[in-house]
């Protein structure tokens, strides 16, 4: 039988920083919850609490709608650090 993956306990960056609102225009704050292909990372990997994960998801979706963050990235255009040029 396959072994279960064990994830280490991670702590919410937003709770520690006492963030009250996550703005969709602040892409540097949103980069912690995006993968190198600009996909939203799950809570178990980022350690974000449920409250802040919902706020982050809404902010990322709004930023995508306003074209601050791309929806998808092609396999040829994958970047290691998506916010390097900002």
Curated annotation (Swiss-Prot):
Instruction: Note the SUPFAM superfamilies from the entry.
Output: Ribosomal protein S18
What Gene Ontology terms for biological process does this UniProt record contain? translation
Q: Which GO cellular component terms are attached?
A: cytosolic small ribosomal subunit
Q: Which UniProt keywords apply?
A: Ribonucleoprotein, Ribosomal protein, RNA-binding, rRNA-binding
Which Pfam family name is an example for this entry? Ribosomal_S18
Q: Which InterPro entries match?
A: Ribosomal_bS18 (IPR001648), Ribosomal_bS18_sf (IPR036870)
Molecular function (GO) terms listed? small ribosomal subunit rRNA binding; structural constituent of ribosome
- Top-level taxon of origin: Bacteria
Oligomer and partners:
Part of the 30S ribosomal subunit. Forms a tight heterodimer with protein bS6.
Q: Which family does it belong to?
A: Belongs to the bacterial ribosomal protein bS18 family.
Fetch the PANTHER family from UniProt.
Answer: 30S RIBOSOMAL PROTEIN S18, SMALL RIBOSOMAL SUBUNIT PROTEIN BS18M
Q: What does this protein do?
A: Binds as a heterodimer with protein bS6 to the central domain of the 16S rRNA, where it helps stabilize the platform of the 30S subunit.
Name of the featured protein: Small ribosomal subunit protein bS18
Which organism is this entry from? Campylobacter fetus subsp. fetus (strain 82-40)
